[in-house]
Structures are given as C-alpha cells and as structure tokens.
C-alpha cells in the first residue's frame, strides 16, 4: 500500500517537473572506449590514467633535475615526450629554444597535431611565443607554450585522448609546495626513521 502510494506520488511529481524543463543541454554519448567501465553485474571500474601504460607515456612527476614517467622511468634534464617514446632535449633554458632545437618536431611521421612546450616555472615571454608559433605555423603544427607544471598536465590529458601530441619539457628551477606535499614528506620521513 505504501509502495503504491509512493509510486503514484513519484509519477505525479515527475509529471509536474517535466514541463518546467524546457532548455536542457543535450548530453554527449559515452565513447566506445568507456564501455568497459561498467560491468553488467553492477560493478563500476575506475582507471587512473597515469598508471595505465596502455595509454602511452605520461609524466607523473617532476623536480628541478628531471621527470618521472608512468613506467617508473626517471629522466634527468630537459626531455621530449611522445605518446610511446621519450628523448633527451638539448636545451638548458627557454632562451635556448630556437628553430634548431625545434627542428625534430616538424619531421616526425605521423605528423603531430599539437606541440606543448613547458619552459620551466616562469611565464612564457611574448617574443618567444611569437617566434615559436610563427616557426611551427609553417608546418601546420599547433603550439602551446606553458609553465612545465601545466604542460605536463596538458600532455597527459591529450595523450589519454589518443591525440597526436608531443611535449618538450624543461625542468623548473623552483618548485612550489602545498600542504599535501609537506604532509607526504613528513609521512615518508616517519616511515624511513620508524624503528620497531
């Protein structure tokens, strides 16, 4: 009896609300590659991108000395990261970025859609941005010039979407720490010096 009353009230409530929803944005269909996220026995699976090596290389960490990738490889110095490979990049700072240091990217096959350049911890100078964009425009390659932290995140996102992307990264000179970083360091130190 109570269940029947609740169903009736629920139907009437929905009917009252439906006419009011007039301008609704359509939802996009779920891509085919997410069809594995729901198992038919009611279980939902979660995939953390930067631990999945099937999605290609991703930058999971950086320091003043270099970068850590999702396959646990640690690289020292500036690097060029591609979806399936990584190379050392022969620049010391953003002042060294010129047509010669970028000459690798237009010659790649298959052609990349986007080149992301992480220039350390400083904001990109307008003169550098203009020079790089004009050079890459000749080869019809889009360029994003960002701080290294933002460049790593952008590369990981585009790589997870299976875009043809490359990333050139210079390690930052200064790192910014947040409360979580300090807490993690304290916990690691406690585990290291903990004796039984």
Curated annotation (Swiss-Prot):
GO process terms (BP): mitochondrial respiratory chain complex I assembly
Q: Summarize subunit and interaction data from the UniProt record for this chain.
A: Together with NdufAF4 associates with mitochondrial complex I assembly intermediates during its biogenesis.
Please name the InterPro entries in this protein's record. MTH938-like_sf, NDUF3, NDUFAF3/AAMDC
Question: Which SUPFAM superfamilies does this UniProt record tie to the protein?
Answer: MTH938-like (SSF64076)
Database matches in Pfam families: DUF498 (PF04430)
The name on file for this protein is: NADH dehydrogenase [ubiquinone] 1 alpha subcomplex assembly factor 3
Gene source species? Drosophila melanogaster (Fruit fly)
Q: Which family does it belong to?
A: Belongs to the NDUFAF3 family.
- Function according to Swiss-Prot or TrEMBL: Involved in the assembly of mitochondrial NADH:ubiquinone oxidoreductase complex (complex I). Together with NdufAF4, involved in biogenesis of complex 1 modules N, Q and P-peripheral, but not the P-distal module. Required for recruitment of the complex I assembly factor Timmdc1 to complex 1 assembly intermediates.
Q: Which GO terms describe its cellular component?
A: mitochondrial inner membrane; mitochondrion
Q: Where is the transit peptide?
A: 1-93
Q: What happens when the gene is disrupted?
A: RNAi-mediated knockdown in thoracic muscles is lethal.
State the encoding gene: NdufAF3
The protein's UniProt keywords, in alphabetical order, are: Mitochondrion, Transit peptide
Q: Provide the protein's localization.
A: Mitochondrion
